[in-house]
Design a protein with these regions (language model features):
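Catalytic domains that recognize anionic headgroups
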Residues: 1-172
Length: 172
């Protein structure tokens, strides 16, 4: 996400991060991504902003004009996981709500949804700024080299580099 912040703000990371030196923000780069220079310039020029859910807090831009997610839920993945493992899930069930749970299947759905949504956006009239951070070339790997879905035999974890098999080129 650091390179995303630098790219969206047209500058090197050390320059982009300089104003954050005294920041008390818990996730300082989040603001640099959500309110980037590129987004501001394009929105000021009349572009509509579209953002697709990445499943990664650091690159979610829910404040875009249009935020697209395959799992519309009032809860993020961590909240969903916590709620699903407590008695707080009962009121949700009564209200017909589901706490969105992270997992390999949900990760696959988000990736496929992003590609489908991207294929549909050209049909939307007018100039657009589209932000899509697709977490496919990163662990956990949920597709094999041919694009077939895989279900790893371990607990879902976004930073699981044990999923690397072979060399990096095989995943590109």
């Amino acid at each position: 996400f650091l390179s995303v912040a630098a790219t969206l703000n047209f500058d090197y990371l050390n320059e982009v991060a300089a104003p954050l030196a005294n920041s008390s923000a818990r996730v300082p780069f989040l603001d640099l991504i959500q309110h980037s220079r590129s987004r501001a310039l394009l929105e000021n020029a009349g572009y509509r902003s579209f953002a697709l859910s990445s499943g990664l807090l650091f690159t979610e831009i829910e404040t875009a004009d249009v935020y697209l997610s395959p799992h519309p839920s009032p809860f993020n993945e961590l909240e969903g996981l916590l709620l699903s493992n407590t008695l707080l899930q009962l009121p949700l069930e009564i209200m017909g709500q589901e706490a969105y749970l992270p997992g390999y299947r949900a990760h696959q759905e988000r990736i496929l949804y992003a590609f489908e949504a991207l294929s549909q956006l050209p049909a939307v009239a007018g100039p657009k700024f589209v932000f899509a951070h697709i977490i496919a070339p990163h662990p956990p790997f949920v597709f094999d080299r041919t694009g077939a879905s895989i279900q790893p035999d371990r607990t879902y974890f976004l930073g699981d580099a044990d999923g690397y098999r072979g060399n990096t080129v095989e995943y590109l």
